[in-house]
């Protein structure tokens, strides 16, 4: 099945973060099953971030596609480069953002799956 008309959402100050989060959904919401909450490319312009938040009832896996991410994993900060993958299990906390002085947009692939 080919998906050519992808839905784009823009979330402002998501989870108390700064700026806009552009979410380019890979598949139509109607086709998402009981296991998947979201599968999308997430784009953050310089200075934009998703605020620190907890996953409850689901987990998230993120792959850095391009740019450099500032990632907070339960209070431990790290830098993600293209190809790096992080996972936030159910009940854990995280945030991710693009540095204010970044020279390019941050592109991520995000998969949020419901917990069993």
Residue ranges and their predicted role:
Residues 1-36:
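A short, N-terminal "cap"/entry segment at the start of jelly-roll beta-barrel domains
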Residues 23, 39-43, 61, 85-87, ...:
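Conserved hydrophobic/aromatic beta-strand scaffold that supports enzyme active sites
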Residues 25-27, 40-56:
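Conserved short histidine dyad/triad with adjacent acidic residue
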Residues 46, 57, 76, 92-93:
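A generic "binding-loop/recognition-motif" signal
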Residues 52, 71-72, 88, 94-102:
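Short beta-strand His + acidic residue motifs that chelate non-heme Fe in jelly-roll/DSBH
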Residues 57-69:
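Glycine- and acidic-residue-biased ligand/ion/polar-headgroup-sensing regions
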Residues 75-90:
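Short acidic-glycine-tyrosine-enriched beta hairpin
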Residues 87, 102-116:
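A short hydrophobic beta-strand segment most commonly corresponding to one strand
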């Amino acid at each position: 099945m080919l998906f050519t008309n992808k839905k784009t959402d823009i979330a402002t100050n998501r989870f108390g973060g700064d700026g806009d989060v552009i979410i380019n959904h890979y598949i139509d919401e109607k086709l998402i099953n009981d296991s998947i909450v979201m599968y999308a490319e997430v784009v953050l312009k310089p200075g934009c971030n998703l605020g620190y938040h907890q996953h409850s009832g689901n987990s998230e896996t993120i792959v850095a596609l391009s740019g450099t991410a500032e990632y907070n994993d339960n209070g431990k900060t790290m830098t993600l480069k293209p190809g790096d993958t992080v996972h936030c299990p159910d009940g854990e906390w995280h945030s991710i953002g693009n540095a204010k002085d970044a020279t390019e947009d941050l592109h991520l692939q995000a998969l949020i799956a419901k917990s069993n």
